[in-house]
Amino acid sequence: MQSATEFLKPRIVEVDRASPLHAKVIMEPFERGYGHTLGNALRRILLSSMVGYAPTEVAISGVVHEYSTIEGVQEDVVDILLNLKGIAFKMHGKAEAILKVSKSGEGVVTAGDIEVGHDIEVLNPDHVIAHLTKGGKLDMEIKIEAGRGYQPATARKVSEETRAVGSILVDASFSPVRRVAYAVESARVEQRTDLDRLVIDIETNGVVEPEEAVRTAARILVSQLSVFADLEGTPAESESPRSPQVDPLLLRPVDDLELTVRSANCLKAENIYFIGDLIQRSETELLRTPNLGRKSLNEIKDVLASKGLSLGMKLENWPPAGLERP
């Protein structure tokens, strides 16, 4: 028998899969009101915080701006860019990649025509990009990046020095969740009939399975709320101030990143000895480094991404006191 002050926890979790991309996740019982409290929080996280992959920059041969038309191609550039946004990409161990499409002659250009490596998947290869007429030709380079939520092109700062000539910035919708809704129904436990059943109806693009998306959203919510469970009072004035804590990963030498000898030597020549030094540099700054080109830069970015880091990060209190440089 449950006491009057004890909170119910969901004991039943059911997954009803309509397809590999569409499922309903049903959880019960919840105390009255908790279905809406948790359902709304999970829905917002699912829509805004799932990691996905999207085109962010496109360069089309012979095209200067997005309002152009291409001879021999039925769609104009705006339509081609919209079609590219509908492709579901999945990358393994990479934060960004440059993909190419090259096709000529009458026919349909689909996502399956994109040249990808072993570490990149196109999950909907039949998705149509454009239609070519007789004598038509389409050559493109597509930059794919990892991200979360929606990011308009105007919000991304891309240096003109590193941006390819004729490339077009694209509004990026990274979220792998196409649609999510929740409903709260009545549930019953023994004599109690005022409880909630939470039903989350979710559809993804295949980059992440519906159930895994819900699990990830729940972990994010728990992580964000856990800080409130450890609230402490304001330290007394007599206590000595604590020195800022620095992530031990940032104190490791760049040699630990296992970069090529060329890349590592270029960094050290710029007095970049620690990972904390490196992540504060921007792409533009690194490209100004003698003998460090785009290939080395991409290598550095991929290695940092595998550790949850990126270039251009801001660190307070760096370097920490007592840090000895070679």
UniProtKB/Swiss-Prot annotation:
UniProt cross-references to NCBIfam families, sorted A to Z: PRK05182.1-2, PRK05182.2-5, rpoA
Described purpose of this protein according to its UniProt entry: DNA-dependent RNA polymerase catalyzes the transcription of DNA into RNA using the four ribonucleoside triphosphates as substrates.
Protein name: DNA-directed RNA polymerase subunit alpha
Any Pfam family hit: RNA_pol_L
Biological classification of the source: Bacteria, Pseudomonadati, Pseudomonadota, Betaproteobacteria, Nitrosomonadales
Domain notes: The N-terminal domain is essential for RNAP assembly and basal transcription, whereas the C-terminal domain is involved in interaction with transcriptional regulators and with upstream promoter elements.
Residue ranges, annotated region (Alpha C-terminal domain (alpha-CTD)): 246-326
Keywords: DNA-directed RNA polymerase, Nucleotidyltransferase, Transcription, Transferase
GO molecular-function term, one example from the UniProt record: protein dimerization activity
Reactions the enzyme catalyzes: RNA(n) + a ribonucleoside 5'-triphosphate = RNA(n+1) + diphosphate
Cellular component GO terms, alphabetical: cytoplasm; DNA-directed RNA polymerase complex
Family: Belongs to the RNA polymerase alpha chain family.
Record SMART domains: RPOLD
